Regions:
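Extracellular and organelle-lumenal recognition/adhesion modules and their flexible linkers in secreted
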Residues: 1-219
Protein backbone atom coordinates (compact mmCIF):
# COMPACT_ATOMS: atom_id res chain seq x y z
CA UNK A 1 0.00 0.00 0.00
CA UNK A 2 1.22 3.49 -0.82
CA UNK A 3 2.41 5.79 1.95
CA UNK A 4 -0.31 8.28 1.06
CA UNK A 5 -3.01 5.69 1.61
CA UNK A 6 -1.51 4.66 4.94
CA UNK A 7 -1.35 8.29 6.06
CA UNK A 8 -4.95 8.86 4.98
CA UNK A 9 -6.08 5.84 6.97
CA UNK A 10 -4.17 7.13 10.00
CA UNK A 11 -5.80 10.55 9.76
CA UNK A 12 -9.25 8.97 9.42
CA UNK A 13 -8.62 6.89 12.53
CA UNK A 14 -7.43 9.90 14.53
CA UNK A 15 -10.55 11.81 13.54
CA UNK A 16 -12.78 8.89 14.53
CA UNK A 17 -10.97 8.56 17.87
CA UNK A 18 -11.37 12.29 18.60
CA UNK A 19 -15.10 11.97 18.07
CA UNK A 20 -15.15 9.18 20.64
CA UNK A 21 -16.97 6.93 18.22
CA UNK A 22 -14.78 3.86 17.43
CA UNK A 23 -16.55 0.55 17.94
CA UNK A 24 -14.80 -2.71 18.79
CA UNK A 25 -15.11 -3.62 15.13
CA UNK A 26 -13.40 -0.36 14.15
CA UNK A 27 -10.49 -1.09 16.49
CA UNK A 28 -10.06 -4.62 15.14
CA UNK A 29 -10.22 -3.55 11.49
CA UNK A 30 -7.66 -0.78 12.01
CA UNK A 31 -5.42 -3.13 13.97
CA UNK A 32 -5.55 -5.60 11.08
CA UNK A 33 -4.80 -2.78 8.64
CA UNK A 34 -1.68 -1.79 10.57
CA UNK A 35 -0.45 -5.39 10.87
CA UNK A 36 -0.96 -5.99 7.16
CA UNK A 37 1.06 -2.88 6.37
CA UNK A 38 3.98 -3.83 8.61
CA UNK A 39 3.23 -1.53 11.54
CA UNK A 40 3.05 -4.11 14.33
CA UNK A 41 4.05 -1.52 16.94
CA UNK A 42 1.16 0.75 16.00
CA UNK A 43 -1.20 -2.21 15.87
CA UNK A 44 -0.16 -3.27 19.36
CA UNK A 45 -0.93 0.22 20.69
CA UNK A 46 -4.40 0.13 19.11
CA UNK A 47 -5.02 -3.38 20.47
CA UNK A 48 -4.10 -2.31 24.00
CA UNK A 49 -6.36 0.74 23.74
CA UNK A 50 -9.23 -1.59 22.92
CA UNK A 51 -8.57 -3.84 25.91
CA UNK A 52 -7.38 -1.16 28.36
CA UNK A 53 -10.44 -1.53 30.58
CA UNK A 54 -9.95 -5.28 30.97
CA UNK A 55 -6.42 -4.91 32.38
CA UNK A 56 -5.21 -7.38 29.77
CA UNK A 57 -2.30 -5.49 28.23
CA UNK A 58 -0.50 -7.42 25.51
CA UNK A 59 3.30 -7.17 25.41
CA UNK A 60 5.74 -8.43 22.76
CA UNK A 61 6.52 -12.10 23.18
CA UNK A 62 3.22 -12.98 24.85
CA UNK A 63 0.35 -15.13 23.63
CA UNK A 64 -3.03 -13.44 23.91
CA UNK A 65 -5.71 -15.35 25.83
CA UNK A 66 -3.90 -18.67 26.20
CA UNK A 67 -6.79 -20.03 28.29
CA UNK A 68 -9.45 -19.08 25.72
CA UNK A 69 -11.49 -16.92 28.07
CA UNK A 70 -11.96 -13.97 25.69
CA UNK A 71 -14.35 -13.83 22.72
CA UNK A 72 -12.70 -14.97 19.49
CA UNK A 73 -11.92 -11.97 17.28
CA UNK A 74 -10.50 -13.56 14.10
CA UNK A 75 -8.62 -10.27 13.76
CA UNK A 76 -5.71 -8.34 15.22
CA UNK A 77 -3.64 -10.21 17.78
CA UNK A 78 -6.53 -12.44 18.82
CA UNK A 79 -7.29 -16.04 17.93
CA UNK A 80 -8.16 -16.83 14.32
CA UNK A 81 -10.16 -20.04 14.02
CA UNK A 82 -9.65 -22.29 11.00
CA UNK A 83 -12.21 -24.13 8.90
CA UNK A 84 -12.06 -27.36 6.92
CA UNK A 85 -14.50 -30.08 5.81
CA UNK A 86 -14.90 -32.78 8.42
CA UNK A 87 -13.60 -30.63 11.29
CA UNK A 88 -15.62 -28.94 14.04
CA UNK A 89 -13.69 -26.42 16.16
CA UNK A 90 -15.20 -24.95 19.31
CA UNK A 91 -14.54 -23.74 22.86
CA UNK A 92 -15.19 -26.54 25.36
CA UNK A 93 -16.34 -25.55 28.84
CA UNK A 94 -16.40 -29.13 30.15
CA UNK A 95 -12.92 -30.47 29.34
CA UNK A 96 -10.23 -27.94 30.22
CA UNK A 97 -7.06 -27.43 32.24
CA UNK A 98 -7.60 -23.90 33.49
CA UNK A 99 -10.02 -21.03 33.13
CA UNK A 100 -13.44 -21.36 31.53
CA UNK A 101 -12.63 -23.12 28.25
CA UNK A 102 -10.19 -25.14 26.22
CA UNK A 103 -9.97 -25.12 22.44
CA UNK A 104 -11.38 -28.36 21.07
CA UNK A 105 -11.58 -29.93 17.63
CA UNK A 106 -13.53 -32.97 16.53
CA UNK A 107 -12.56 -34.82 13.33
CA UNK A 108 -15.30 -36.96 11.78
CA UNK A 109 -13.08 -39.25 9.67
CA UNK A 110 -14.24 -37.95 6.30
CA UNK A 111 -11.25 -35.83 5.28
CA UNK A 112 -7.49 -35.31 5.37
CA UNK A 113 -7.25 -31.61 6.28
CA UNK A 114 -4.16 -29.46 6.36
CA UNK A 115 -5.42 -26.95 8.88
CA UNK A 116 -4.52 -24.46 11.55
CA UNK A 117 -7.19 -25.16 14.15
CA UNK A 118 -6.40 -21.78 15.69
CA UNK A 119 -3.64 -19.26 15.11
CA UNK A 120 -2.60 -15.81 16.20
CA UNK A 121 -0.06 -13.18 15.25
CA UNK A 122 2.36 -12.52 18.12
CA UNK A 123 4.58 -9.40 18.19
CA UNK A 124 8.20 -10.30 18.98
CA UNK A 125 11.67 -8.75 19.01
CA UNK A 126 14.30 -9.86 16.51
CA UNK A 127 17.24 -11.73 17.98
CA UNK A 128 15.36 -12.70 21.13
CA UNK A 129 14.81 -16.30 22.22
CA UNK A 130 11.36 -17.46 23.30
CA UNK A 131 9.66 -20.56 24.64
CA UNK A 132 6.11 -21.55 23.72
CA UNK A 133 4.35 -24.10 25.89
CA UNK A 134 0.89 -25.59 26.14
CA UNK A 135 -1.07 -28.71 26.95
CA UNK A 136 -2.66 -31.10 24.45
CA UNK A 137 -5.15 -33.87 25.26
CA UNK A 138 -6.35 -36.36 22.64
CA UNK A 139 -8.99 -39.04 22.30
CA UNK A 140 -8.63 -41.65 19.53
CA UNK A 141 -6.84 -39.37 17.08
CA UNK A 142 -6.10 -41.49 14.01
CA UNK A 143 -3.56 -41.30 11.15
CA UNK A 144 0.17 -40.65 11.41
CA UNK A 145 -0.32 -36.87 11.53
CA UNK A 146 -1.79 -35.58 14.76
CA UNK A 147 -1.89 -32.21 16.47
CA UNK A 148 1.17 -30.03 17.04
CA UNK A 149 2.18 -26.47 17.93
CA UNK A 150 3.97 -24.42 15.28
CA UNK A 151 5.70 -21.05 15.00
CA UNK A 152 6.75 -19.38 11.77
CA UNK A 153 7.80 -15.90 10.78
CA UNK A 154 4.96 -13.53 9.94
CA UNK A 155 5.85 -11.65 6.76
CA UNK A 156 9.49 -12.66 7.25
CA UNK A 157 11.64 -15.68 6.45
CA UNK A 158 14.02 -17.89 8.41
CA UNK A 159 11.72 -19.29 11.07
CA UNK A 160 9.54 -22.40 11.07
CA UNK A 161 9.49 -24.89 13.93
CA UNK A 162 7.00 -27.27 15.50
CA UNK A 163 6.47 -29.83 18.24
CA UNK A 164 6.01 -33.55 17.60
CA UNK A 165 2.42 -34.42 16.57
CA UNK A 166 0.22 -36.01 19.24
CA UNK A 167 -1.95 -38.96 18.14
CA UNK A 168 -3.98 -41.73 19.75
CA UNK A 169 -5.42 -41.20 23.22
CA UNK A 170 -3.52 -39.27 25.86
CA UNK A 171 -4.11 -37.23 28.98
CA UNK A 172 -2.85 -33.64 29.08
CA UNK A 173 0.68 -33.61 27.65
CA UNK A 174 2.87 -30.53 27.95
CA UNK A 175 4.34 -29.39 24.65
CA UNK A 176 7.38 -27.08 24.60
CA UNK A 177 8.96 -25.26 21.68
CA UNK A 178 12.06 -23.04 21.83
CA UNK A 179 13.03 -20.68 19.02
CA UNK A 180 15.06 -17.57 18.24
CA UNK A 181 13.54 -14.78 16.16
CA UNK A 182 15.59 -14.03 13.03
CA UNK A 183 16.78 -10.57 12.04
CA UNK A 184 14.12 -8.37 10.49
CA UNK A 185 11.21 -10.31 11.99
CA UNK A 186 8.72 -8.25 14.02
CA UNK A 187 6.01 -10.86 14.50
CA UNK A 188 5.40 -14.59 14.33
CA UNK A 189 2.38 -16.68 13.48
CA UNK A 190 1.68 -19.17 16.27
CA UNK A 191 -0.62 -22.03 15.26
CA UNK A 192 -2.26 -25.17 16.58
CA UNK A 193 -1.83 -27.39 13.54
CA UNK A 194 -2.72 -30.62 11.83
CA UNK A 195 -0.78 -31.28 8.61
CA UNK A 196 -2.22 -33.38 5.80
CA UNK A 197 -1.08 -37.01 5.78
CA UNK A 198 0.51 -38.69 2.76
CA UNK A 199 -0.46 -42.19 3.95
CA UNK A 200 -3.19 -44.21 2.25
CA UNK A 201 -5.17 -44.26 5.49
CA UNK A 202 -5.18 -40.49 5.88
CA UNK A 203 -8.70 -39.50 6.93
CA UNK A 204 -8.44 -38.31 10.49
CA UNK A 205 -10.97 -38.96 13.24
CA UNK A 206 -11.01 -38.33 16.97
CA UNK A 207 -10.99 -35.38 19.34
CA UNK A 208 -8.37 -32.99 20.68
CA UNK A 209 -8.25 -30.31 23.38
CA UNK A 210 -5.61 -27.59 23.79
CA UNK A 211 -5.23 -25.29 26.79
CA UNK A 212 -2.91 -23.19 28.96
CA UNK A 213 -0.81 -21.80 26.13
CA UNK A 214 2.03 -19.49 27.13
CA UNK A 215 5.00 -17.75 25.59
CA UNK A 216 7.93 -16.31 27.50
CA UNK A 217 11.28 -14.78 26.66
CA UNK A 218 14.31 -16.89 27.58
CA UNK A 219 17.56 -15.49 28.98
Amino acid sequence: MRAGQRDAAGRAWEKLARLGAPTKGDYLKYCDFLITNGNETGALAIWNQLYSRSNAELKPGRIWDGNFGQPVTNKGFGWRIGQAPGVRIFLDGDIKMAGQYSLSASFDGSSNPDISLASQIVPVEAGHRYEVSGYVKTSRITTDNGIFLQVQGYDCSGLQAGTQPVTGTSFWQKQILDFTVPSGCKAIMFSIRRAASTSLDNRISGDVWVDSLKMAEQG
